[in-house]
Amino acid sequence: MKRAVVVFSGGQDSTTCLVQALQQYDEVHCVTFDYGQRHRAEIDVARELALKLGAVAHKVLDVTLLNELAVSSLTRDNIPVPDYQPDAEGIPNTFVPGRNILFLTLTAIYAYQVKAEAIITGVCETDFSGYPDCRDEFVKALHHAVSLGMAKDIRFETPLMWLNKAETWALADYWGQLDLVRRETLTCYNGIKGDGCGQCAACNLRANGLNQYLADKVGVMAVMQQKTGLAQA
């Protein structure tokens, strides 16, 4: 039996990964992390989507210690979430230091216990928003360390790594779930479901990608299929 574990936040990217994983694996588990994030609604959204889409198990892990250590606008109410700034340089204050290091490592422990062959994460270098822990180089390095530490090669799959947001929308549409991803996921840094607040960086990346996809569905879909190797419809 092919078994995978999805690092699942209930946002656009991880939900798209879950939708695809359910088509490619016999059994899919989801792991969501409670790290005292600013908007706890994302945990509820993740629970609802994991159940609705048919994950065989959904584990919510308490890692609130991260909140004490990692100062970010996503972990502190007194640090405002910045509006979208397309020309901004450096690491944004929405970056939570160590988050993906911790999430992937703990998910690997869970995957080891349930005998999963793969961990799937929605990190993306194309639209990585300045987050160093979304880079391909980082994921490969951590995979190497985890494989050594567990003496087991659990694959780290990153299906969105080289897709832009328009192509990520195309991937959701390829699997027939564009409307669900648009209406029922929570990507917004201000905690608003669906199309979100429209002001933060996450909402702007998401909206711009959707508009680009809807403006040229055939072309974007073709590029996505070429990048991912998915069959033409």
Swiss-Prot record:
Instruction: Quote the InterPro entries the UniProt record gives.
Output: QueC, Rossmann-like_a/b/a_fold
The family database entries (Gene3D superfamilies) matched by this protein are listed as: HUPs
Which residues of the sequence carry a binding annotation for ATP?
F8, S9, G10, G11, Q12, D13, S14, T15, T16, C17, L18
What's this chain's function?
Catalyzes the ATP-dependent conversion of 7-carboxy-7-deazaguanine (CDG) to 7-cyano-7-deazaguanine (preQ(0)).
Q: What is this protein called?
A: 7-cyano-7-deazaguanine synthase
- Which Pfam families does the UniProt record give? QueC
Q: Which SUPFAM superfamilies match?
A: Adenine nucleotide alpha hydrolases-like
The membrane spanning regions, by residue number, are none
Q: Which GO terms describe its biological process?
A: queuosine biosynthetic process
Give the pathway listed in the UniProt entry for this protein: Purine metabolism; 7-cyano-7-deazaguanine biosynthesis
Name the protein family.
Belongs to the QueC family.
Give the required cofactors. Zn(2+)
Q: Which reaction equations make up its catalytic activity?
A: 7-carboxy-7-deazaguanine + NH4(+) + ATP = 7-cyano-7-deazaguanine + ADP + phosphate + H2O + H(+)
Which of this chain's residues are annotated to bind Zn(2+)?
C188, C197, C200, C203
- Keywords, ordered alphabetically: ATP-binding, Ligase, Metal-binding, Nucleotide-binding, Queuosine biosynthesis, Zinc
Class of enzymatic activity (EC top level): ligase
UniProt cofactor note? Binds 1 zinc ion per subunit.
Give the EC number(s) under which this enzyme is classified: 6.3.4.20
Q: Which gene encodes it?
A: queC
This entry's Gene Ontology molecular function terms read: ATP binding; ligase activity, forming carbon-nitrogen bonds; zinc ion binding
Q: Which CDD domains match?
A: QueC-like
